Amino acid sequence: KHYIGLHNESTNKKAAKAAAFVCFKPATVYGGEFFIADGERIFRDLDPAVIKELYEKQVRISAVNLDLDVLGNLPGGFKETAMDKATELVDKTIIPKFDMDFELIWGTDGNDMRLQAIEEVQSPVNRHPDTGRPAWFCNMHNQARFLRDRRPCAVPEVGMTDIYFGDLSLIPGEMLSHVNKVCEDNIVHVPMKAGDVLLCDNYRVLHGRDIFEGDRLHAVSWFGDEKADVADTGGKPGDVLNNLLNTFLVGK
């Protein structure tokens, strides 16, 4: 059982303009409802002081945790050398599989022997490419560990995401709670039966999925892939972050 919070699909490199969500089979026991929210309404409803601070400080998303505590047992200079080699290995073999720019950093969350892949600094607000209107364009509701720890989450530690200010300082819990409340106040559940298709504007509409039990089969097709002018929030169409972690590990 895993709750997928509100998110857009994009990276600092690409963003899909639209998506078609298709239901082939609803959950056979219960749950699994698809839900959406209007990014313009979220932007409008957020406390202006919160928006101002997040916009000025920007945000960064940690996407992958590699716990390498075994290296901590090495003596003296061997430890530092091993950490450097581990960073180099991950940078050359794993990071290229992502169509994203990551910085590999040790110990951001206080665990000295944890190597994290952290996205570039990005804005929590974007302007729609056609209308020019501002909208909340941030995966905080889905990727903040503070929120994930307070709802059903089946993601293993290696894929446990988190979100920080642009300088990698912690975002206060009260700010995350406020964003969570505004997001959830704007959620609209979309019950779908087999054969239903939902078209969404990815620049304006965030989407997520409730917990479920039983078998469930949905799919999504992205179109209008283009370069993104504004740094985003967590995963391009079909990327490893949202589709590996949400689909293969927890069942999107």
Predicted regions mapped to residue ranges:
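Conserved donor-binding loop and adjoining core beta-sheet/short helix segment
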Residues: S10
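Active-site environment of non-heme Fe oxygenases that use a 2-His-1-carboxylate facial triad
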Residues: H2-L6, K14-V197, Y203-K252
